[in-house]
Amino acid sequence: MAELQTGKPTPLGASFDGNGVNFALFSADAERVELCVFDERQQEQRIVLTARSGDIWHGYLPDAQPGLRYGFRVDGPFEPSQGLRFNPHKLLLDPCARQLDGWVVDDASLQGGIDQRDERDSAEIMAKCVVTAEDYDWQDDQHPQTPWNQTVIYEAHVRGLTQLHPDIPEDIRGSYAALGHPVMIDYLTSLGITALELLPVQQHADEPRLQQIGLRNYWGYNVLLPFAVDNSLAAGDDALNEFRDAVKALHNAGIEVILDVVFNHSAELDVEGPTLCQRGIDNRSYYWLGDSGEYHNWTGCGNVLRLNHPAVMDWVMDCLRFWREVCHVDGFRFDLATVLGRTPDFTAAAPLLSAMKNDNRLQGCKLIAEPWDIGHGGYQLGQFPTPFAEWSDRYRDDMRRFWLHGDISLGAFARRFAASSDIFQQRDRLPYASINKLTAHDGFTLRDLVSFNHKHNDANGEGNRDGTDSNFSNNHGTEGLEADDDIHQRRQASQKALLTTLILSQGTPMLLAGDELGHSQQGNNNAYCQDNELTWLHWDHADRGLREFVAGLIQLRRTIPALQQETWWQEGDGAVQWLNREGQPLTPPQWEQGEHQLQILLSGRWLVLVNASLHAGAFMLPEGHWQVSPPFDETNPPEGGMWHGQAQAVCVLIKQTA
């Protein structure tokens, strides 16, 4: 192998220039850094990086090529009370690596030591980084750039969406290749969604506890290498290009790709977790630590990345630019996004949030925050700056309570229906900022929401202690999927009422993949470790009628001007009128204490009839000739200026023009 040259400090990671590879690694406290390269026989060669520019250690290896397997050993003080945990016996991954060879297994040699160094060498068992080339023919690929006011998001897991689809070739099911297959593209376009939000596709690791009980981290939130495309979701050997092929196919169909990304914690977990990367490279720069060097745990995952540190912030920004520029993704959903604004308290003016919104290379990206973590002051719904949108748990909970429990007022329902203006408008945000959702990957599916009163998570191996107990669900009289015809009909009506509310609310709707098909997880509301038929969509048993209903709702949404406007609904602007059952404006007492019966007139022509009460009701319609709008059942049309609505039902009428 050629002799190492000085190289350069940027960019971080391993960069192939056609003639060799430049390596650059950040570590402020290290005293010695070794580049470790491995041949086909796992033989290790160590090369000291003698060049240092500021806190960047670097070197250039002439003649090195893509495919080279490598890692680092970093030496320095081991003083846990000072936050220093250097251990040269541990082979470390490059935080900027683009590809991983192998898997992180549960092995004692990966432990770095709690109070003193663990001197067992980890190189033999440790996964290795791989040098990559990033050339790719994007042809004429363009970002769809769907305006927020026209966006409908579909949250899905790559494998869960495609693994059991009978019309996708068996050898690619569950992969990026399946995601980009014409069968899947046709399904998504026929449904009418505009953006596919993928659960993490960053390279993740399975937690030791899960490995010990024979489970896997299915969701992928235990991220190991945020720059690397997860190999476990690839059908072939080239995960990066397979993923890019899928993005290109989705773009060609006008569908945006939004990635769920994890920058709040790492796969190194708590102090008893493995030393794989940041802990051994520069522990006190990468992590939030207490006065005695202990890890803060505002994420519930054992550690918290210190995203206000300049070097760590730069690392995150470089990662976002990689996914935007190299992989052409259209946006990001940030898991536990309060961590992004911690300094350590949350502020909307945090350096990382400011960098994201002002970065020219990220212009046009959709940015979505999950606005909470479990630390002090962690709940920050409505507090993120423009241009962020935010997952609204208030929408989820209030709409569930309205339809399934009847314990919130018409006023609360209307506030959520109107893009939660009470939360977002006061901060000069626009309606799109409210990501309206009924369900998501964490929690009950929609079918389970109307079939189970209690979680059933025993398969997760935690004695049913995991997962929330606050579901606001309603099994309609019988626990579980099996029920008599009357209960099935009431469950179906509840699903349709909830879905209608979701799709026709102002704001940005997000649909969980499978909800339109009647998918159940058998009452498991925390299926993060169930990479099996519990979570995979069963296409052969799909509720086709419900799917057609949802597609019709999305098409209906596109025709209603009030749901396409970018500004807030204002009294007198013609966008919305709120009427009682008699067709008159609601009185203050009716808003807060009235029956759960409401007429919502949108753009003067579409009438959403809401009967969430427990008994049928007759609605006196506004003046005009009204007909049932598709996709609603035309067997119950209005007659004589009245509409007779069943209990806990919803319908949309359209005024006929001359």
Curated annotation (Swiss-Prot):
Residues 457-468 have a biased composition (Basic and acidic residues). The keyword Heme does not apply. Its EC number is 3.2.1.196. The record marks D442 as: Transition state stabilizer. Keywords: Carbohydrate metabolism, Glycogen metabolism, Glycosidase, Hydrolase. Pathway: Glycan degradation; glycogen degradation. SMART domains: Aamy. Residues 457-481 are annotated as: Disordered. GO terms for biological process: glycogen catabolic process. The active site is at D335, E370. GO terms for molecular function: glycogen debranching enzyme activity; hydrolase activity, hydrolyzing O-glycosyl compounds. It holds the Pfam family GlgX_C. It comes from the Bacteria. It catalyses: Hydrolysis of (1->6)-alpha-D-glucosidic linkages to branches with degrees of polymerization of three or four glucose residues in limit dextrin. NCBIfam families: glgX_debranch (TIGR02100), PRK03705.1 (NF002983). PANTHER family: GLYCOGEN DEBRANCHING ENZYME (PTHR43002). Removes maltotriose and maltotetraose chains that are attached by 1,6-alpha-linkage to the limit dextrin main chain, generating a debranched limit dextrin. This is Glycogen debranching enzyme. The gene is glgX.
